[in-house]
Amino acid sequence: MSATVDGATAKPITKKLTFLFRFASTIALWSVALLIIFSGYEIAFFCLIAAIGLLALWEFYGMLDAKGLPNFKITAMLCGAIMLSGSFYYYSKVGVAQSYDFEMAVLLGFLLTVFTRQMFDSLRDDAPLRTMAYTLFGLLYVLWLYNFITKIVYVVPRAPDGAVQGQFYVLYLIAVTKFSDMGAYITGSLIGRHKLIPHISPGKTWEGFAGALAFSSLASLGLLYLMPKQLAVLNPTHAIVLGLSLGFAAVIGDLAESLIKRSTGVKDSGNFLPGIGGAPDLVDSLLFTAPLLFFYLRLVVLAP
């Protein structure tokens, strides 16, 4: 029975209200993040990005723990912190090539550590293989993909005075990704009839998917129109291609986390912010849009 106050039945939280809570919380958090990014204090930006990334990784392994799936959470957290710190240092102070080498070295060290750690546990059927697989998947899916947000800041050449210019592309990334989420919800709520993948996410529709692509494309073109100097390496063709690509990747990122939550029997990955859930719910779409934008900038826009 629903809880009552003075004899009145408490009204259930509607889907619309949940979306509004989630949207407001997301905007509030990323507004703070962008203020820090644009403050010019690169170390402050790193601390914020690292905190969100490590929290997302911790809560991901928490979902596995809730299902009883074995993993080496602490080992992954330590390696994740090293990866984030090293990538920030090499990208901001040394160079891109050295950053790649460092990242590969961390992954190699992580594999060696996980195998060595597993050797001291007893062999129980396929438990060792599952433990190592779950641990490695968590680091790659959450932290390795998430780390591309930092890379985007530094993949764009600095200004002549040495100032970082890549923060505008992080703003672009977040805005286009979140407009995709918004477009999927609004369009799906208004005209959604045909289910997209109901066994993973019953509420998502093909109409919502089309709305996500439309909103992300319009957001991409709109941002280029509003900030032509700040997004100087992009042109309208890039904006259209990225708008469609990032919108598609955002939907896949959202569905990917829904798949993981259904597999682990968890509704929300945590209680990081009202209406959002956990940190993985906050960054799920960005896990695929961030690397996509990075590689597009590096291999298409900024290619020699």
Language-model segments: what does each one mean?
Residues 2-244:
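Membrane-embedded alpha-helical bundles of polytopic integral membrane proteins
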Residues 184-185, 189-190, 258-266:
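Juxtamembrane interface at the ends
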Residues 263-285:
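Interfacial loop-to-transmembrane junctions
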Residues 287, 292-295:
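Hydrophobic alpha-helical transmembrane segments of membrane transport and translocation systems
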Residues 295-304:
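Juxtamembrane boundary at the C-terminal end of a transmembrane helix
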